[in-house]
């Protein structure tokens, strides 16, 4: 298995004006982030607007990204549902060769108990040899996975290798890092706004949204963090701080697509029920982006 740590990119799914997948822009983004030094890719996650994609579109995206990446860096595939049986079916329908792991979100809407969450991931792990990264994002799912459940899972299932922790609760993240019962269990930040302190506190990296706009900047930020050069890391972090806050003002991925449009990487079209970033947001991002360029 290739090494999954450092900076992973939660890829957008670019669309054209007709709402069709813009594969040329997808190829451009994938090539850009790989060439700029990110460590791995994550596709078909929240940022990729996966709930709006048909199965054939998902397969086409997978093939496109594989073709461009050419095994240069690891790829993690998003595969989650609030129906456990749906995940098991998807495992059978999609070819998982050349993927290093799957990223599977905690069941949403149903609001299962911790025992339900445990059995959901236990069942998935029993039905695949793939490595599994749990995705905890309670502000979207309505359910938060706790430390005891994580430790039960990793104690009983060797192929559950990590968690993308996006609760926004840095204390919870630190608890996962400090009190996990397996040292090699990976804890990734799933939140760009607190990714740096999580890595400085012992986390294994970040699955980033903003990184597809600033891959080189993030590469430097986190390399400084791993070397415990805190001042240098934060100096670079604060250069993108205003942009980072703006990107999430109108939701994800509307904001990041607006920024990617400014950078010439893709259009800002999204699929309903999301709306594309407003002209006001685009103007603010344009100003801050140009201000940032002036300081380099």
From Swiss-Prot:
Per the annotation, which location comes first and is thus the protein's main one?
A: cytoplasm
Give residues annotated as binding pyruvate: 47, 207
Localization per Swiss-Prot or TrEMBL: Cytoplasm
Q: Where is the active site?
A: 135 (proton donor/acceptor), 164 (schiff-base intermediate with substrate)
Quote the CDD domains the UniProt record gives: DHDPS
GO MF assignments: 4-hydroxy-tetrahydrodipicolinate synthase activity
**Gene3D superfamilies to which the protein is assigned, alphabetical:** Aldolase class I (3.20.20.70)
Feature type site, description Part of a proton relay during catalysis: 46, 109
Q: Which reaction does it catalyse?
A: L-aspartate 4-semialdehyde + pyruvate = (2S,4S)-4-hydroxy-2,3,4,5-tetrahydrodipicolinate + H2O + H(+)
Keywords of this entry: Amino-acid biosynthesis, Cytoplasm, Diaminopimelate biosynthesis, Lyase, Lysine biosynthesis, Schiff base
Summarize subunit and interaction data from the UniProt record for this chain. Homotetramer; dimer of dimers.
This molecule's function is given as:
Catalyzes the condensation of (S)-aspartate-beta-semialdehyde [(S)-ASA] and pyruvate to 4-hydroxy-tetrahydrodipicolinate (HTPA).
- Into which family does the record put it? Belongs to the DapA family.
- Its name, as the record gives it, is 4-hydroxy-tetrahydrodipicolinate synthase
Q: Which organism is it from?
A: Karelsulcia muelleri (strain GWSS) (Sulcia muelleri)
């Amino acid at each position: 298995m290739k090494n999954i740590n450092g900076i992973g990119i939660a890829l957008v799914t670019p669309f054209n004006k007709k709402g069709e997948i813009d594969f040329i822009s997808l190829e451009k983004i994938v090539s850009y982030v790989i060439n700029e030094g990110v460590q791995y890719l994550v596709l078909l996650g929240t940022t990729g607007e996966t709930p709006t994609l048909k199965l054939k579109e998902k397969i086409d995206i997978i093939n496109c990204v594989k073709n461009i990446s050419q095994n240069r860096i690891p790829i993690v595939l998003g595969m989650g549902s609030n129906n456990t049986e749906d995940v098991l079916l998807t495992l059978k329908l999609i070819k998982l060769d050349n993927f290093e792991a799957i990223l599977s979100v905690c069941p949403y809407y149903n609001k299962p108990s911790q025992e339900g969450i445990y059995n959901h991931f236990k069942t998935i792990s029993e039905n695949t040899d793939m490595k599994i990264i749990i995705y905890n994002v309670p502000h979207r799912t309505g359910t938060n996975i706790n430390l005891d459940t994580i430790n039960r899972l990793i104690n009983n299932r060797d192929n559950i290798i990590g968690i993308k922790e996006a609760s926004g609760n840095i204390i919870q993240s630190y608890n996962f890092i400090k009190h996990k019962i397996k040292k090699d269990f990976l804890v990734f930040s799933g939140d760009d706004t607190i990714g740096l302190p999580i890595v400085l506190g012992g986390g294994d990296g970040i699955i980033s949204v903003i990184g597809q706009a600033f891959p080189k900047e993030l590469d430097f930020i986190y390399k400084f963090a791993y070397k415990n050069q805190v001042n240098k890391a934060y100096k670079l972090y604060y250069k993108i701080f205003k942009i980072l806050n703006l990107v999430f003002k109108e939701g994800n991925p509307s904001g990041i697509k607006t920024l990617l449009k400014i950078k010439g990487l893709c259009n800002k079209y999204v699929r309903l029920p999301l709306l594309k970033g407003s002209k006001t947001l685009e103007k603010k991002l344009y100003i801050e982006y140009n201000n940032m360029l002036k300081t380099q």
